[in-house]
Amino acid sequence: MAYKMHTKSFILHSDFSPSGDQPQAITQLIEGLENGLAHQTLLGVTGSGKTFTIANVIAKLNRPAMVLAPNKTLAAQLYAEMKAFFPENAVEYFVSYYDYYQPEAYVPSSDTFIEKDASINDQIEQMRLSATKSFLERRDTIVVASVSAIYGLGDPDSYLKMMLHLQTGAIINQRQILAQLAELQYTRNDQAFERGTFRVRGEIIDIFPAESDDKAIRIELFDDEIERLSLFDPLTGSSFGPVPRYTIYPKTHYVTPRERILNAIEKIKQELAERRQFLLENNKLLEEQRITQRTQFDIEMMNELGYCSGIENYSRYLSGRNEGEPPPTLFDYMPSDALLIIDESHVTVPQIGGMYRGDRSRKETLVEYGFRLPSALDNRPLRFEEFERLAPQTIYVSATPGPYELEKSGGEIIDQVVRPTGLLDPEIEIRPVAIQVDDLLSEARQRADQNERVLVTTLTKKMAEDLTDYLDEHGIRVRYLHSDIDTVERVEIIRDLRLGEFDVLVGINLLREGLDIPEVSLVAILDADKEGFLRSERSLIQTIGRAARNLKGKAILYADRITNSMQKAITETNRRREKQMKYNEARGIVPQALNKKVGELLDIGQGANQKAKANRNAKKVAEPTALYVVPQTAKEYQQQIKKLEQQMYKYAQDLEFEKAAAVRDQLQQLREHFFEVQ
């Protein structure tokens, strides 16, 4: 059956029109893409509106796009921004759906085999399915993804073949529909109607599609004919009205037609026989017994159920690819004329290059010791050269582009240095190392008195801890951000810094791309003259840029000599600052402070459920007002505390970090009130 794609145009919603360097950057990027340039680099400084520029390019070219981000946090931030720019179009989110993931591994030195263990986030799985569905169905699609996009996914050809097409008036009996749903790995559940399940009541079949979070489809049969199709709310049961046709997508990306599974089983048996012979010839009897037992169990499971635990290790056969060929990934679902935007490319590009090697070494050990067949090596992320081959026209976006991006762009970069707000890059001062701690203490006090914040970056964990203790002893409200802090707590700490719970944040690597704190007026870089990864040109520019969102932004570099990296970072920052000042003077622009609300970060999945958003309480999470009803007795207090704790952990588990932080604040207030009453 030919597949028809919806051709709706992108409609950009914004209260602002492009300004500063944005109009010029948009024009240059569009011209480059229309002239067939495969690679372009956008050098956009912090706060210059890079996302808005990219949104304008996508809207004007009207082409589907994938935006790659280096981590889940930044991907979520970009998803929220793109969702706001394109509320009428398909903006999707595609990141790893594991809350916890322990890959299968073997440690020969201790003869320890570690079974694969994983916890899948149901909401993110739904968003991944929604992302591939949008790429297959709609032209007006933007998928914001992490490097999870280069990992193996189900074969799109098999995925498309397995779809169940429903149409009013079609002749199909109930038994056929139920059999096809079972093939799509949907399960029947007449009690709990959840995502990926269906229920049957007489001649009515209700299906809750795996990629949907708020709409289910009802099939009403009259004998062997589909009499009516209608969408309804699975929670309330209220109808959204009839639809002429509907397509049910498989419950998972890894679903495979029965004939291909049977074909794969024969090839697996053949490989197993060859592997057994090899192991026996090399006197590896234990390994031979192990691989035989494990593989035969998998074959039986696939024969009976159509899948098995770890079925992805047989992806070479299931996708019909030859040895060494790249696995199917999200790139195989993209339309051929899609755009690829790599955000924070100086971090993301090296990440893409590093994924394959780590995965390969772990799997080679499993193969060598008889836990997996050699074909399991083809269940892998893309190699870098394969990624390059598959990537469509690409725009690299970074404040500090790396050598790879510059080489691919032929050394030509598109500058976006002037901010729409007129804000300038921070002033840079160099002060001697000998006075760095006491000088920092003095600067921190001045900033705290003016209700401003300070970021301090050190070289070692010990130095960061000692500095935090020293500042604390001298009355500075200070916190220390270190590598042991998880994502939820990190979001909470940054939120508390913005709210003024403390004034100084100390860390080792605070250049984290996308760390958006307009209240920070001072960045202090200790031991700036120690060459290395944390004091490279890019690291220094990124760290200095953390103060670029404040009217009084300043960076102090404590150093006894000016290193090559320092000189380059200072020269580049001064170049940008000079260009910004000239632009402002020529147009009479007065720099304006950013008033970004603390609550405007992200709620992963909020965009996916507009109804929930509309019904949500209007209060922002940044507001310290408690939303609970004040209990009257000790028992009521304990019940309320327990209830809020459960709610907080649920939000954290769903990656809704800001909601979790808001509930944490409520808990703290409730506990304080309880102790006062006691």
UniProtKB/Swiss-Prot annotation:
Tell me where in this chain the Helicase C-terminal domain is found: 436-589
Q: Which GO terms describe its biological process?
A: nucleotide-excision repair; SOS response
- In this chain the UVR domain maps to 638-673
Binding-site residues for ATP, renumbered to this chain? 44-51
Q: Which residues form the Helicase ATP-binding domain?
A: 31-417
A GO cellular component annotation here is: cytoplasm
Q: Which family does it belong to?
A: Belongs to the UvrB family.
Q: What does this protein do?
A: The UvrABC repair system catalyzes the recognition and processing of DNA lesions. A damage recognition complex composed of 2 UvrA and 2 UvrB subunits scans DNA for abnormalities. Upon binding of the UvrA(2)B(2) complex to a putative damaged site, the DNA wraps around one UvrB monomer. DNA wrap is dependent on ATP binding by UvrB and probably causes local melting of the DNA helix, facilitating insertion of UvrB beta-hairpin between the DNA strands. Then UvrB probes one DNA strand for the presence of a lesion.
Domain annotation text?
A: The beta-hairpin motif is involved in DNA binding.
The record's subunit annotation is: Forms a heterotetramer with UvrA during the search for lesions. Interacts with UvrC in an incision complex.
What NCBIfam families does this protein map onto? Answer: PRK05298.1 (NF003673), uvrb (TIGR00631)
Mind telling me what this protein is named? UvrABC system protein B
The record lists the organism as Pasteurella multocida (strain Pm70)
